[in-house]
A protein has these predicted regions:
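Extended alpha-helical regions
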Residues: 86-88, 94-102, 108, 192-211
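Structural signature of eukaryotic scaffold interfaces centered on beta-propeller domains
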Residues: 91-103, 163-172
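Mid-length scaffold segments of soluble, non-membrane domains
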Residues: 105-140
Length: 211
C-alpha cells in the first residue's frame, strides 16, 4: 500500500497534469485580481479572456465602460493586458517562487501598470498571491540616472519637472527595465539629448513581509 501511495505522489509531482497546474498559476492570480487592479473588468471578463487565450483565440472582451480590453500575452509566469487604450498591465510571477507549493503564501509577483496620457508613465507594485501588497524593493530611478553628465541643463530641468518613466517586465527573467520618456520635450530639446540617455535594468526581488 505504501508503495502505491509513493508511486501516486511521484506521478502527480512529475506528470504533465502537475506541470499544467504550475503553468496555470499566473492565470489564477489574474482571475482573482481585485477591482483596484482591473477596475474595468469583472471576474467573468477575466475568465473569458483566459479561456480565449488558452484556446488560441483573440482574448478581447467588452469592459464596463463599453470599451475593449485584451489579454495580449499569457504564459506560465507572465501576462500582459491592454486594459484600455491608455493603460497596459503586466504581471510576472518571480522565479524564486515555488510554483509546485500548495501554499500560495510563498508565492510573490510583480505588477506594472503603465498609463499613457499620451506619454507613458508606470507604477510598480509587489504582491503575494492573496493580493496582499508587499514592501517596495524596486527603486524608481531619478531623471539624472538616465542622463549622461553633458546633457544641457535646461533639458535636464525640463525632464525633472515632469519625470515620466516607463517600466517593462521581462517575460524571460526576473528583471524590470526603466526608460525615461522624452516625448514631452520640444523637437529641439530632443535633438540635444540624442544618444545621451540610457535604459536602466534592475532585478526584481520581493520581500515576504506584508505592508
Amino acid at each position: 500500500m505504501k508503495r502505491i501511495l509513493l508511486l501516486f505522489i511521484y506521478l502527480f509531482t512529475f506528470s504533465p497534469f502537475h506541470l499544467l497546474m504550475a503553468q496555470e498559476r499566473i492565470r489564477d492570480i489574474y482571475a482573482a485580481a481585485p477591482d483596484s487592479i482591473c477596475p474595468l473588468l469583472t471576474k467573468n471578463n477575466r475568465l473569458d479572456q483566459i479561456d480565449f487565450r488558452e484556446n488560441n483565440m483573440k482574448a478581447e472582451v467588452k469592459n464596463k465602460f463599453d470599451g475593449h480590453s485584451e489579454l495580449l500575452v499569457l504564459s506560465e509566469r507572465y501576462l500582459q493586458l491592454r486594459l484600455s487604450d491608455h493603460c497596459l498591465v503586466e504581471m510576472k510571477l518571480l522565479s524564486d517562487s515555488t510554483l509546485a507549493s500548495p501554499s500560495d503564501a510563498d508565492l510573490r509577483f510583480c505588477i506594472v501598470q503603465t498609463y499613457s496620457a499620451p506619454a507613458p508613465d508606470s507604477r510598480v507594485r509587489l504582491f503575494d498571491t492573496a493580493w496582499h501588497e508587499l514592501p517596495q524593493t524596486i527603486n524608481r530611478p531619478s531623471v539624472d540616472d538616465f542622463l549622461s553628465e553633458d546633457v544641457d541643463i535646461d533639458v535636464r530641468l525640463a525632464l525633472q519637472a515632469l519625470p515620466l518613466i516607463k517600466a517593462s517586465l521581462s517575460e524571460n527573467d526576473d528583471t524590470i527595465t526603466f526608460e525615461l520618456q522624452t516625448s514631452e520635450l520640444t523637437r529641439e530639446q530632443r535633438k540635444l539629448i540624442e544618444g545621451k540617455t540610457r535604459q536602466i535594468v534592475q532585478k526584481v526581488i520581493a520581500e515576504e513581509k506584508r505592508l
